[in-house]
């Protein structure tokens, strides 16, 4: 009998080696995963996760599914009389009885959306028979992600061109601008209600889940959407240096003359000032644009894209200059001060001094007037 091969003995020895479970001492609850690219119904349920024994009125009317990655297409399955809103020029094809389908141009709040830079031309598709539509974008590096809104959590779409298609009888879309936090809400779309929404963004879309008390700082060009929670995102700027240096004002060293006052009122001086202001804004976007961020606090859910859009698509000129001019760490204090009511100072009204006038009538009928200096003198 031949002995066992040393290779077999080595393989058996490796089988007997047991790995000890490693204990996680400092586990993080922040979870980053690829966003679900399909919204198929569960076994025994519909696209909204409802059980199979629900009534006919509660059954989902549509199903979204993403085909392929990263050059993906969106497949939308519609039930009869269900309305699908998709961006104009994104419909690729229709499967089913196309004679029963109807497509109309829908204009959604053109004034408010055009002012915020949000697309307002959409195509409304409906059919009296079941229909399947294919939707795609013109960009070759765009992927899709599906948002499932069940009525309990609202979402804010941060990028202007991220919302591609949606469906749902109770799904409401409204453009939002917050004067207190215009950075996070400028050109955003608020989604509320119940339905399905498809988002498109350059690169791959990832889902980031923050636990309670956790913080995450993200560049606004990579934030596609986030869930609306009790902690709104705050503008954040990274420090360029640990030393705080103050540059003295050069104009304060020279005396104020009439020549400089007259030059400031001329059109040439104002044109040069606008040119320098635009040059500073463009340099802040191109050179120092990596210092503008958004700070999120949990619990919340973020959808982030691997390839960010331009800063000009998410921030305006005023917002870029406002963040760049503000000192690091002063934004939370400003938000706290704005939430507190201002103390109204009572205006003190000064009473006018009272005066006493004395009128005396003589025997000849003449009347003479004089002012009394003191009340005691008048009593006398």
Curated annotation (Swiss-Prot):
Question: What keywords does the record list, in alphabetical order?
Answer: Mitochondrion, Transit peptide
In its UniProt record, which GO terms are filed under biological process?
inner mitochondrial membrane organization
Listed InterPro entries: AIM24 (IPR002838), AIM24_sf (IPR036983), Trp_RNA-bd_attenuator-like_dom (IPR016031)
| Keyword NAD among UniProt keywords | no
Q: Where are the transmembrane segments?
A: none
FT transit peptide: 1-37
Which superkingdom is the protein from?
Answer: Eukaryota
Q: Which Pfam families match?
A: AIM24
Subcellular localization, per the record?
A: Mitochondrion
What do the Gene Ontology cellular component annotations say?
mitochondrial inner membrane
**What family does the Swiss-Prot or TrEMBL record give for this protein?**
Belongs to the AIM24 family.
Its protein name is Altered inheritance of mitochondria protein 24, mitochondrial
